[in-house]
Amino acid sequence: MENILDFTLEELKEWLISKEEKAFRAKQVFDWIYNKLIFDFNNMKNIPYKTKNLLSDNFYIGVPKVVKKLMSQDKNTYKFLFEYKDGNIIESVVMKYKHGNSICVSTQVGCRMGCKFCASTLDGVIRNLTSGEILSQIMAAQKEIGERISNVVLMGSGEPLDNFENVTKFLDLVTSDTTLNIGQRHITLSTCGIVPKIKELADKNYNITLAISLHSPEDLLRKEMMPIANKYSIKELMEACDYYINKTNRRITFEYALVKGKNDSIKEAKKLSTVLKGKLCHVNLIPVNEIKENSYEKSTLKNIESFGNILKENGIETTIRREMGADINAACGQLRRSYVSK
């Protein structure tokens, strides 16, 4: 059986026609799934009994089961553990802002990138998520909170560009007016920096925001923090970023997790200013998420502010990320790992 969420409207129309069914039934089914959030063919009232049986015999609606739901004390962050049909568990985070609800989705079960500050990668990657499985996190979360989600961040477990085909099909699906109709400018994709895939993504000319996990302006330190840096130098990464900017005319966000005594010095800030000078970019400074498997500690707020001021003095737009959901292990991979290891 196939997950119907992996299908575009046109693909489902073609399938129905091949079974001598009416093509317009596809739009009715999509309306039940995406607008009414009905995840059982038998509850689709305007679909004939024969068509329901045909769909039930060939498809399932692959929305995951909620195995854990946590809410932060301020009620602005929800953390979900979702379980798929095969028993694999992933996590998603919903953050409530004045401008709307945002969800951080996972693109893989686990991750193989090995970044030292990330809990998602500690047990490696188990498998890729399909386009429909990524999409289903938004639908399951919307049903749980009873509100529309209007912004998507691909920054949960997994490296999106390591699952390129499924992620790009997800982007096509989620932005379609036949499904969730989320605008491309409301989507951010975060990558550790797989250079050829950044260029491939640029060629698709999406209007999404690309976020690069940079974390150091120096190759030696970046290699220590992020194994991907052993494959692609900062020079190569910056060339790929320039290609992306020139191709899409979209500003890139550089994510920089500040680790006490590691990458938060004035010297590092000045070097980063040099690396990024003249680029259409924005820097997001992040207090590193502390995990027990390494000795990384958060920089002090004073250090983070001093670091940011140097970037601003050099004409680089900079913000400090607001921490949300710390009381519910909302950082990437932390909740899933604690649940799975029980």
Swiss-Prot record:
The active site is at residues 91, 332. Binds 1 [4Fe-4S] cluster. The cluster is coordinated with 3 cysteines and an exchangeable S-adenosyl-L-methionine. One of its GO terms (biological process) is tRNA methylation. [4Fe-4S] cluster binds at residues 111, 115, 118. GO terms for molecular function: 4 iron, 4 sulfur cluster binding; metal ion binding; rRNA (adenine(2503)-C2-)-methyltransferase activity; rRNA binding; tRNA (adenine(37)-C2)-methyltransferase activity; tRNA binding. The keyword rRNA processing applies. Disulfide bonds join 104-332. One of its GO terms (cellular component) is cytoplasm. Its main location: cytoplasm. CDD domains: Radical_SAM (cd01335). The keyword Cytoplasm applies. It comes from the Bacteria. S-adenosyl-L-methionine binds at residues 158-159, 190, 213-215, 289. Residues 97-327 form the Radical SAM core domain. It catalyses: adenosine(2503) in 23S rRNA + 2 reduced [2Fe-2S]-[ferredoxin] + 2 S-adenosyl-L-methionine = 2-methyladenosine(2503) in 23S rRNA + 5'-deoxyadenosine + L-methionine + 2 oxidized [2Fe-2S]-[ferredoxin] + S-adenosyl-L-homocysteine; adenosine(37) in tRNA + 2 reduced [2Fe-2S]-[ferredoxin] + 2 S-adenosyl-L-methionine = 2-methyladenosine(37) in tRNA + 5'-deoxyadenosine + L-methionine + 2 oxidized [2Fe-2S]-[ferredoxin] + S-adenosyl-L-homocysteine. Its cofactor is [4Fe-4S] cluster. It is found in: Cytoplasm. Its EC number is 2.1.1.192. Keywords: 4Fe-4S, Cytoplasm, Disulfide bond, Iron, Iron-sulfur, Metal-binding, Methyltransferase, rRNA processing, S-adenosyl-L-methionine, Transferase, tRNA processing. Reaction proceeds by a ping-pong mechanism involving intermediate methylation of a conserved cysteine residue. Specifically methylates position 2 of adenine 2503 in 23S rRNA and position 2 of adenine 37 in tRNAs. Belongs to the radical SAM superfamily. RlmN family. This is Probable dual-specificity RNA methyltransferase RlmN. It comes from Clostridium botulinum (strain Okra / Type B1). The lineage of its organism: Bacteria, Bacillati, Bacillota, Clostridia, Eubacteriales.
